[in-house]
């Protein structure tokens, strides 16, 4: 039976939304065990007594890593936090994967320092799936913040892992790989990006060249590789812009005149489609590529739906032996 360790105390809607998602996933995934780490009393109140069985368990912890905690200090000092205890279960082989909605930096630290890097991987990278305008498939972008500074060989390894993920987990044949840069020409960018371009071009990947920031959502790439500093800034920009657009539309329609509101009723289906396009819940969470087990981060504001989809994503990663394939591949390099 596959086992997912879940930090039940991380995120704005914890533990209620997490328990709701787990109960829904449990009913659909009979070969998967869910271990919830957190305040035992709170969790027991939320879980019907008949649901506690071989497929669902609670591991009592007494501490929580808060969003404002300094990541590395937090995982060292809060040994009995829900996140750290869950990470140690994965390290010790008592669980196959770790999921959290909590402090991103602390989760990255748990992945790197507790669960550990895959032999042969220079630096793990954080990878979400983001929407595009002409497809429901979206695209993967890595790294979006696990590393402040990057070397060309880091970007090559991230591209290799992301390409394999896109093919095996998302079902995309021969994924198109592109390098985020400040121009489409091969000589664009600083020394790191120029060197990364050459490494990607000489690899066995389906490398399609550079991509600029204004093209990211056009569906030109299945995987976009970038340094962590730039990737994090771009990710926040995409999230902020989508939120801004939806807010402006909603405000205009609700505060407009009678004719505006009548018009809104007529285009309600199109507006719902637009909102759905920006909704990344169906893609699951962001993956820390390059560590010894699946470590996945879901947005801290998530409700039941994105958590549920992330549980399905994590389960598929375990089922498909994704991390073991990475270990086999990079051990020989």
Curated annotation (Swiss-Prot):
Homodimer. Probably interacts with PlsY. It comes from Lactobacillus helveticus (strain DPC 4571). Its EC number is 2.3.1.274. GO terms for molecular function: phosphate:acyl-[acyl carrier protein] acyltransferase activity. It holds the Pfam family FA_synthesis. HAMAP family: PlsX (MF_00019). It comes from the Bacteria. This is Phosphate acyltransferase. Pathway: Lipid metabolism; phospholipid metabolism. InterPro entries: FA_synthesis, Phospholipid_synth_PlsX-like. Coiled coil: none annotated. The keyword Cytoplasm applies.
